A protein has these predicted regions:
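Rossmann-like NAD(P)(H) cofactor-binding subdomain of soluble oxidoreductases
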Residues: 1-36
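Generic secondary-structure signature for well-ordered alpha-helical cores
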Residues: 12, 16, 67-72, 128, ...
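Short, surface-exposed acidic
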Residues: 19, 72-78, 138-146
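A hydrophobic C-terminal alpha-helical subdomain
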Residues: 99-111, 161-183
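Generic recognition of cysteine residues
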Residues: 2, 16, 32, 72, ...
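Substrate/ligand-engaging "lid" and interaction regions
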Residues: 28-126
Length: 183
């Protein structure tokens, strides 16, 4: 989330004076999990992922250059939008938080497939905060339920819970073995 801004600050801090193009995607193109060092299991590929450059005036140039390789990228107006649209920052901590005891007991469960309506409703409440931040900045963000359909066009279901359970890219993703997985 807003990694391009952090990267630019680092380049500036260390005095980089070369010409460069800097951009970020809202999330990974792939739904994937690491198998071991150097090996990743790609479970699904998103249909659409927001993308923006810093400065935003470079977005079209970069998109035109990489479009043959990443046709899923969709232009966002700026990196604040790509940063605030990082739904993983809502999904991952919420699902882990509401399943912390299960994870700590090392009980195996499917991260999305075992979603419950109540946990999905809590996720939507957390997401309301993200939407309010976007609105304060004049950015109309997608809510989590609509985002799944945006990213994975063929996902079935009306509710967040149904879409999480029915998204083929999420079907075989197991929960982490520790609540400290992404420190």
């Amino acid at each position: 989330t807003c990694g391009a801004l952090e990267f630019k600050q680092t380049l500036t801090k260390y005095g980089c004076n070369k010409k460069y193009y800097l951009a970020e995607a809202q999330t990974l193109v792939y739904a994937c999990r690491i198998v071991e060092d150097g090996i990743v299991n790609i479970i699904g590929i998103k249909d659409e992922v927001l993308f923006s450059a810093l400065p935003a005036s470079h977005t079209d140039h970069i998109l035109n250059t990489i479009a043959p390789y990443y046709p899923c990228f969709t232009k966002a107006e700026n990196i604040l939008r790509t940063g605030l649209e990082n739904i993983g920052a809502i999904f991952h901590p919420c699902v882990c938080l509401f399943n912390a005891a299960t994870i700590e007991r090392h009980d195996e469960f499917w991260f999305y497939r075992d979603m419950t309506e109540q946990v999905a409703k809590f996720i939507e409440k957390f997401d309301a905060e993200r939407l309010a931040v976007g609105k304060a900045y004049g950015i109309d963000l997608l809510n989590v339920t609509d985002w799944i359909k945006f990213a994975y066009n063929d996902t079935k279901g009306d509710t967040l819970c149904e879409r999480m359970k029915n998204n083929p890219a999420y079907h075989d993703i197991k929960a982490p073995g520790s609540i400290f997985t992404r420190q």
